[in-house]
Amino acid sequence: MPLINLPDFANDLIAEFVERNAERIDTPVIQPAEPFLDIAGEDLRRRIFMTESETGASLCLRPEFTIPVCLRHIETATGTPKRYAYLGEVFRQRRDGANEFYQAGIEDLGDIDLSNADARAIGDATGILARLLPGRHLAVTLGDQAVFEAVVQALGLPLGWQKRLIHAFGNMTQLEALLASLVSPQFVTGLDDDIARLVASGDEQALVAHLEREMQKTGYSTNAGRSALEIARRLKEKLILSETRLDDAAFHVLEEFLSLDVPLVNASAALSGFADAAGLKLGNALSRFNGRVAALSNAGVDLSCLDYRAAFGRPLDYYTGLVFEVTVEGSTAVLAGGGRFDRLLTFLGATDRIPAVGFSFWLDRIETERAAA
């Protein structure tokens, strides 16, 4: 079906994709819902238009393109590296604006030179916007989830807390609430006395046996939920999390890291200074960050319009490293956003690990910006 009501710059956009060796790909509007519900993040999940097939399979209207493009790549067993471009409608429940709108973008799959691929994604996004919005000064905000993960890991927190904090990356309200819980732990309450005693004892085998007896008494079916072993391990994890306290020094280290907000040209020095002062070894995460900055400079990207903000993330759970957004200087309207998602294709069923990075344009916002010229 031909696309209608495309913005007047659509042909320019398609020409840019061709010049950048990105193959145009189409994906179905009706998508399996499960991948989006599992890994797209809470912000997107609550905006999805859900439906189901005659057989009861959960389906949804396409809420974004990255997951569908990756699924199509896996289905066609196409080799890598491969660059895909897309332009089409997505469907989301939004407070402001239409519930269906056009997005376009590029997904770069399988390039093992991560630094250059990251730099190319930012360069493509800003280069295309510069053509569509001549004379406008662009501003790029850049974050890196891998650096945040390295900081959290270096602090030696239990794995459960690391996962919670990493999951909240980019959502400062949620992150601050979790940090408050770490400073003032809330102990587990409301458990049956016998269960509480067994959890505290650390005797997993006895706890599982007790839970199995209780489940049999109440007629609880494991087919409808978690097994006794899963429940026991979840209770144990909750106890560990509730008893973990972040000391003041570690709390201030995290606060200091999250407050970093510097021009990208100064970011490597700022991160190195932070790590040295805190006595943390950030290892490969810092090396990859520095490599990306060098690649951006070598690619001719104007670093003066890029800022690094340590707390900056994007509300999609599949990002693993670089994240970025592009606006017109002085505006809050995000015109392009993207990042690295190295684990997504494996999660979706790819047999090999495929590194990936990409970005999307919000065409309605670009159109509004062009009209304001």
From Swiss-Prot:
GO terms for biological process: histidyl-tRNA aminoacylation; L-histidine biosynthetic process. The keyword Ribosomal protein does not apply. The keyword Cytoplasm applies. One of its GO terms (molecular function) is histidine-tRNA ligase activity. One of its GO terms (cellular component) is cytoplasm. Gene3D superfamilies: Bira Bifunctional Protein, Domain 2. Its main location: cytoplasm. InterPro entries: aa-tRNA-synth_II, aa-tRNA-synth_II/BPL/LPL, HisRS-like_core, HisRS/HisZ, HisZ. Pathway: Amino-acid biosynthesis; L-histidine biosynthesis; L-histidine from 5-phospho-alpha-D-ribose 1-diphosphate: step 1/9. It is found in: Cytoplasm. Keywords: Amino-acid biosynthesis, Cytoplasm, Histidine biosynthesis. HAMAP family: HisZ. Required for the first step of histidine biosynthesis. May allow the feedback regulation of ATP phosphoribosyltransferase activity by histidine. Belongs to the class-II aminoacyl-tRNA synthetase family. HisZ subfamily. NCBIfam families: PRK12295.1-4 (NF008951). This function is generally fulfilled by the C-terminal part of HisG, which is missing in some bacteria such as this one. Heteromultimer composed of HisG and HisZ subunits. This is ATP phosphoribosyltransferase regulatory subunit. It comes from Rhizobium johnstonii (strain DSM 114642 / LMG 32736 / 3841).
